[in-house]
Amino acid sequence: MTTKPPLTLRLAAPRGFCAGVDRAIQIVEEALKKWGAPVYVRHEIVHNRHVVERLEALGAIFVEELEECPDDRPVIFSAHGVPKSVPAEAGRRNMIYVDATCPLVSKVHVEAERHFNAAREIVLIGHAGHPEVIGTMGQLPEGSVALIETVEDARAFQPRDHANLAFITQTTLSVDDTADIVAALQSRFPGIATPHKEDICYATTNRQEAVKVFAPGAELVLVIGARTSSNSVRLVEVALRAGAQDAKLIASADDIDWSWFNGITTLGLTAGASAPEDLVQGVIEACRDRFEVTVETVKTADETVTFKLPRVLAG
């Protein structure tokens, strides 16, 4: 019998689903129970193909635009948030709609409105084209929000009024990258209005902090998540910056190239906020097939946050 090589697997805690993702998935499930299939969902409810396929099997139909939905079936808006024009159009068509926007994203929308009503010029730190950024910018008239993606953008930004500025941020960014951009803005515009509470969400921060703890001793870090998942992509970047020798983004155990493990004795494993736990366990089992695995849980925070369902689905 061949002896399996040893592998120490450092498992991040917390990892995977956050409260906003849990709530969004539950909204689709409860809508299907209440109204039956099909229920339409505008954009992937969360950025994870496995989650989407499971909900499709239950009767959810995913579309990119509201015009693809019939008037007489319920539609759900994804956790990332939508421009104001979307619920306005649904209302005009007398559609039943449920907004699954994460409450932490909605908080950023409220901040944007507050700054706009105070006649401040608004800077959004985020990634162009991400659904959350499109949704946040779409809360206000076109041209009201300037998007800044990098420190260089912050240094080059020319506001209309240096003394009347505010910034908000996409919730799923790298904590460190955002800090650098904020510092660049504040050095140029000391009076810029800041969020009441940091916009980077608790789950994004917690998952990045766990990776920072185990990355320095890891020869390889695997992050389970979709390439369209901003927070998952950031976890790979955080792992490399924190000292991991290598880091890869995988959708599931099927994506693993086992040549990555040549000479490896220490693996770090985590999952983005939209990746279900069964994918994590699948990677652990795949490792056990090839290695004598010792799992060490690296716990850096307790998460007790939960969000209520919209009133139309509660109770």
Curated annotation (Swiss-Prot):
Cofactor notes: Binds 1 [4Fe-4S] cluster per subunit.
Annotated EC: 1.17.7.4
Keywords: 4Fe-4S, Iron, Iron-sulfur, Isoprene biosynthesis, Metal-binding, Oxidoreductase
Single GO biological process annotation from the record: terpenoid biosynthetic process
Protein's gene: ispH
Chain sites annotated for binding (2E)-4-hydroxy-3-methylbut-2-enyl diphosphate: 47, 80, 130, 171, 229-231, 274
Described purpose of this protein according to its UniProt entry: Catalyzes the conversion of 1-hydroxy-2-methyl-2-(E)-butenyl 4-diphosphate (HMBPP) into a mixture of isopentenyl diphosphate (IPP) and dimethylallyl diphosphate (DMAPP). Acts in the terminal step of the DOXP/MEP pathway for isoprenoid precursor biosynthesis.
Co-factor requirement: [4Fe-4S] cluster
Gene3D superfamilies, sorted: 3.40.50.11270, 4-hydroxy-3-methylbut-2-enyl diphosphate reductase, catalytic domain
Pathway recorded for this protein: Isoprenoid biosynthesis; dimethylallyl diphosphate biosynthesis; dimethylallyl diphosphate from (2E)-4-hydroxy-3-methylbutenyl diphosphate: step 1/1; Isoprenoid biosynthesis; isopentenyl diphosphate biosynthesis via DXP pathway; isopentenyl diphosphate from 1-deoxy-D-xylulose 5-phosphate: step 6/6
Family note: Belongs to the IspH family.
Gene Ontology molecular-function annotations: 4 iron, 4 sulfur cluster binding; 4-hydroxy-3-methylbut-2-enyl diphosphate reductase activity; metal ion binding
Listed NCBIfam families: ispH_lytB, PRK01045.1-2, PRK01045.1-4
Residues reported in the UniProt entry to bind dimethylallyl diphosphate: 47, 80, 130, 229-231, 274
Catalytic activity: isopentenyl diphosphate + 2 oxidized [2Fe-2S]-[ferredoxin] + H2O = (2E)-4-hydroxy-3-methylbut-2-enyl diphosphate + 2 reduced [2Fe-2S]-[ferredoxin] + 2 H(+); dimethylallyl diphosphate + 2 oxidized [2Fe-2S]-[ferredoxin] + H2O = (2E)-4-hydroxy-3-methylbut-2-enyl diphosphate + 2 reduced [2Fe-2S]-[ferredoxin] + 2 H(+)
Binding site for isopentenyl diphosphate: 47, 80, 130, 229-231, 274
Enzyme class: oxidoreductase
Alphabetized CDD domains for the sequence: lytB_ispH
Binding site for [4Fe-4S] cluster: 18, 102, 201
Catalytic machinery residues: 132
Name of the protein described by the UniProt record: 4-hydroxy-3-methylbut-2-enyl diphosphate reductase
Pfam families found in the cross-reference section: LYTB
Lineage per the UniProt record: Bacteria, Pseudomonadati, Pseudomonadota, Alphaproteobacteria, Hyphomonadales
